[in-house]
Amino acid sequence: MATLFRGALIGGAVLAAALPATGQQTDADPDTMRVCASTKDAPYSTADLDGFENRIAEIIADEAGLTLEMVQVEKDAIFLHRDGIEQDICEVIIGVDEGDERMLTSEPYYRSAYAFVARQDRGFEGHTWQDIDQEGYDTFAYRYHSPAETILKYSGRYEYNLIYQASLVDFEDRRNQYTQVPAERVVDEVSSGKADLGILFAPEAARFVKDSREPLEMTLITDRIERSDGLVIPLQYSQSVGVADDSPELLEKIDAALESGSARIRAVLEEEGIPTLPMN
């Protein structure tokens, strides 16, 4: 029950295939780059293909001289590898952590960090995770399954914030299912004054911070979390393109495209308002 439609691509062709969440196997074409893209992952990827990672996929395919097939998966992005690459409906995922062990990864094409988002009229000052411990900052909005939860736990703010955070998903039971707060909702909570501070990965916040009617400021967190058991949780991450393990030739083409198209990719990130860090 797949529906097909065509869209425009700078200098090339893009074929977007909307598939049910269970996926549908298709034969790989060496002249086609099949990218799995979530319909529920704004601002990275959307059903309308206007996410910034959708645009980066177009640039990579164009630079590599490949036809882009966007395989839209109607699930959250966390399921793209399991329900996409493992089901052989695509070979590529845009925007994975460098060195992700589930697949081959390209050279990173940008690096960013978790960030604090605050209203400008609050005058928040801080750039380390410990800086949330300030008078007047009691309510925090964040996305689940992220270092933000660890920051709140280590700051002694997690339990106090639990009921408010649960309200962001309408108190949905999180047991045995994946539950997530949209990035836009996190930023809206700060903009409206319902949350004193937002904590989330800067790339997922940037578009909504820029578009907010209430002036907001986003501050990158500069340190990392060192847990009591010695485990270090980084708060800065380099982003790469994930490629299926059995497609090393495609990875080579993607690496070359990332290099030749670096200025175009940088322009997308700048337009999105994403703050970037030097590569390690």
Residue ranges and their predicted role:
Residues 39-42, 46-63, 116, 120-181, ...:
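Bilobed "Venus flytrap"/periplasmic-binding protein-like clamshell domains
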